[in-house]
């Protein structure tokens, strides 16, 4: 099971529900030092903590991933949550919890440098 850091676009409720299922998940909103960090800083923090970063900010994190690759560096992994797959409606929180839980229940680990779009669970 891969440990995760949810960026500040996600509620601490999601992290709490996933922790209740036995997953190692932290939410940036729960740590005052993480709130308001620039995208490159939150990715660096997640990488230093060996946690894959979960974000819905696809347009900014794809270029950050490219910068890591160009520098021959690997982040701890990126899980991208597409608004097309997970619309921001009343089902969003439950759908993200379900999809992340299904992903984390798989025996394979998220690899350093890996980027994946979260599939709907």
Protein language model annotation of sequence segments:
Residues 29, 57, 82:
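Short beta->alpha connector loops at strand-helix junctions that form conserved
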Residues 39, 45-66:
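Acidic, metal-binding active-site segment of PIN/NYN-like and related structure-specific nucleases
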Residues 25, 43-44:
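Short hydrophobic/aromatic segments of transmembrane alpha-helices and their interfaces
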Residues 31-35, 51:
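Short, surface-exposed loop/turn motifs that are enriched in glycine and acidic residues
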Residues 1, 24-25, 49:
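Short, surface-exposed connector motifs at secondary-structure boundaries
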Residues 22-31:
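Short, basic, glycine/proline-bearing loop/turn elements
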Residues 1-8, 12-20, 34, 43, ...:
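Acidic, PIN/NYN-like endoribonuclease modules and their adjacent C-terminal/linker elements
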């Amino acid at each position: 099971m891969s440990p995760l850091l949810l960026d500040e676009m996600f509620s601490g409720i999601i992290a709490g529900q996933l922790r209740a299922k036995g997953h190692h998940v932290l939410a940036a909103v729960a740590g005052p030092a993480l709130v308001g960090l620039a995208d490159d800083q939150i990715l660096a923090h997640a990488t230093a903590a060996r946690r894959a970063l979960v974000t819905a900010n696809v347009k900014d994190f794809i270029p950050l991933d490219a910068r890591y690759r160009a520098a021959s560096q690997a982040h701890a992994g990126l899980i991208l949550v597409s608004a097309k797959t997970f619309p921001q409606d009343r089902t969003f929180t439950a759908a993200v919890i379900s999809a992340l839980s299904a992903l984390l229940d798989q025996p394979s680990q998220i690899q350093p440098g890996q980027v994946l779009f979260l599939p709907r669970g």
